[in-house]
UniProtKB/Swiss-Prot annotation:
Family matches, as InterPro entries: AI2M-like_HNH, DNA/RNA_pol_sf, Domain_X, GrpII_Intron_Splice-Mob/Def, HNH_nuc, RT_dom
Protein name, per record: Uncharacterized 91 kDa protein in cob intron
Transmembrane segments: none
This protein's UniProt keywords: Mitochondrion
GO molecular function, one term: DNA binding
Domain spans labelled Reverse transcriptase: 281-566
Amino acid sequence: MRRCGIYVYPHRERDILCVKIWTIHLGSWGNPMPNRACVQKVLPVTKQISSDGSVQIDTVRAVLPEFQFPSHPQIGDCLSWIETFFSRSLVGFYDQGYTPGEESCTNSTIKGMSGKPTSIISNIYTTTGPAKVSNDYAVRDPGVAVDHFDQYGPLKEGRSLNSAKISTQWSGSATLKSSNRSIFNIGLGYINTFLGVSNVRGFSTGSGRSKNVLNKLDDLSKRSKNYPNLVIDRNLYKDFLLNRDMFLIAYNKLKSNPGMMTHGLKPDTLDGMSIDVIDKIIQSLKSEEFNFTPGRRILIDKASGGKRPLTIGSPRDKLVQEILRIVLEAIYEPLFNTASHGFRPGRSCHSALRSIFTNFKGCTWWIEGDIKACFDSIPHDKLIALLSSKIKDQRFIQLIRKALNAGYLTENRYKYDIVGTPQGSIVSPILANIYLHQLDEFIENLKSEFDYKGPIARKRTSESRHLHYLMAKAKRENADSKTIRKIAIEMRNVPNKIHGIQSNKLMYVRYADDWIVAVNGSYTQTKEILAKITCFCSSIGLTVSPTKTKITNSYTDKILFLGTNISHSKNVTFSRHFGILQRNSGFILLSAPMDRIAKKLRETGLMLNHKGRSVIRWLPLDVRQIIGLANSIIRGYDNYYSFVHNRGRFATYVYFIIKDCVLRTLAHKLSLGTRMKVIKKFGPDLSIYDYNSRDENNKPKLITQLFKPSWKVNVWGFKSDKVKLNIRTLYASHLSMANLENLQCAACQSTYKVEMHHVRQMKNLKPIKGTLDYLMAKANRKQIPLCRSCHMKLHANKLTLNEDKKV
C-alpha cells in the first residue's frame, strides 16, 4: 500500500496550500505513483475537522493512510493519540477539491506508542528524509508541511513566497494550490534560490509495511547482489521471523514433504497446523523465548561403508528453520561462487557434471577431494563470526546459534556439540555452503595465480612440413588416390607443431563437501596445490580426508564424482572446420559406472547373477502398482544418466534386468509358472488396458505399461540449465493465504479453530465413498482442513461425515 499525507493548514483566510512530491525523488527504488485510494478514508475526517466547534480525534493508526499530521511518527505501526489541535483549517487534495470550514481546538501533545518520547508539535517533523538504499522497500508518498503564512494573506499567482515557511531536505516536484485555483509546479531544490523560500522540509507517512514479504526478500537479494561488500543492516528478525506470511510460505513449502510427518523427540508433526499455532510461535519469537527442541539422532548406512549420523528435529521447529534458510539464501545466493553446485536453486549434480564436461578438457591431473566429516566438524564460533561479518541483526544471528546448539538425544543422553551443523536440519546445507564459500574463494585465488597461457603461434615439426610438401606435390602431379591416402594417414600420426611453453590451467567444481580440482600442469604442481588446499582447510577447522582424497591421471584412470565415471577419451577423432580436417583429442567422457549399478541392484534384491529376481515385498501389491514401481526405478536411472556416453549399454542392462524382475514377480503372484505366460497375458511391453473405455480408434484405453528408455546417446542431455535467481519465482507459488486462513472444516463446515489434517502418503488413503479419505483422494491432496473438534474425533476414529459412514 502506498501512502500519501494530508496537511491541515491553519489560516484565517480559508485558503489551502497542498504540496505533493513524487516518490521517485526519495530513493532509487521509490514508487513514483501517488496513492489516491486513501482519499476516501481521509474525507470523513476532513469534514469532521473542518466543522465548527471542538473535535477530538482518537487513535489514528499510521499503518493505514488515514490522516497525516505534522510531527507524525515515522514508525508505521505506532499509535498516536491526538487529543486536541488548535487550528482554523482548510483541508484538500489536488484534483479532489476541498471543503472550507472553521473549527477551534485545544493545543496538546502527540504521544507515540513506539517508544519515542512525547513531544510538543513544532516546526521539526519526525518523518523526514528519503527512503534509504539499505531500506529500499520503504515506499513513501510524502506531503510537504507548510508551517504558516504571515500577515500578507493567501498565496497569489506570481507572488513571492518569502512569507511562507516551508521545510524540506530533498529536491522534488511540488504543486502549490491556492483558493483562486492558481497552480505552481516547482522543484523544491529551486525554492530557496528561485523563489526565495527557506526552511522547506518534507515528511513521509509510512514505514513500508505495504510491500509483501516476497518483495522484501527480492529487494534483499538485489541489495546483496548489487552491493556484495556491504553489511546487511536490516531488521531481519522483525521483517521475516515475526511475519505470518513467511510462516505460510515455509508451511506450504514443507507440508507435502513426507519427512514432516516424522516426529522428533516429541510426537509433534505438521498434523494439526493452524494459524493459532503459527501465532503462538511468532509470540514466542517476539519475546525471544523460542528454543529449538533437541533432535532424535539415528545412524544410517553410508555408500562407502560406515554410518552417518542423522538428526531428526521437530517438524514445527523446521518451520522456523525454513524461514532462516530462505532469508540466508536471499542474502548469500548472489554471493556464492559459480563453482559451487550443491543445495542451490537452479543447480544440481547435472549442472556440476555439465561444468566438468564443458570446461575441464585438457586437464591431465585431477584431485578428487573430500572434507572429512564436513557437516559434523564446522566450528560454531567461526561460523557465527562469519555470519556476523555480513549480517548486523544480532537477534537473527542468535536464533541461528540456538538452532546449532539445540543438541540431540542418543543412548538416552542429551548431547550438545560445539562443532558441526546437524545433518537432517533444514538450515544445515545453506550454513555449510556459507562456510565452504571460503574454500571456493581460496581456490579461485589459486586459479588466478596458477593460470598461464603459453604462446599461441608455434612452429611445425620438420616431419609435418615434409609430409605437407609430399601431399602438395602428389596433388600437383595428380598422383593416384592410394598414394595420397597413405601420406594422409602418416600426417595424422605425426605431431603437427612443436610443443612450446606449457599452458597452465586450474579448474574447480564443488558439490557440498565433495570437490574436484583439475590441473593442466605437472604432477609436482598438482601436489603443491593439494598441499595448499589442505593447509587452508586446517586453518578454518576442516580436515581434508587422506583416504578419499587422491590425485588421478584422467588419461589412464577414471575419476568417480557424483556417481559418474569421468575420463579423457583415448580415441582420436577428426572433424572438418571450413573444409580443413582437424584432429580432436582429449574429449571428456562421462559414463555410467556399470559395476556400481549392478551392485546396487543386487543389494536391493532385484538381481542375482545378472538376472532378475522375484521381489517378495511386491507380491501383496496390484499388478498396476508393481509395474509403476518398476517404472520409477527405470526412470530414476534414465533421468540421472541421461547424458552418459555408454547410454546404449547402460539403458539396455537396466531395462532388461528390471523387466525380468517384473516378469518373475508377476509369474509368482499370478501363479502362471513361467515368464512366457506373463508375456502372453500382458504383451511384450507388459501393458494394462481398460476394456470398459475406448479411445478415438475404438481401442481399449491404455492404463500403464513398462517404461522403455531410449538407447540414443545424447551427451548434452543434462536436466539442468542456468537459472536466474528470482525470489518471486522460487516462492510465489507457496504464498497462498487460503491454505491456513479463512478455512472451512471439510466435515462440519465450521470456521472456528480450523487446522490441517495431514497424511504421510496418498497411497495410505482408503477412498471409501462417504469418508474423509474419499474427499482427500478426490481432491488429490495430502492435507485437508478440519476444525479442532472434528480433528480430535478423526484421530479417535469417531468422526462421521453422515449417519452411516465412519472414518
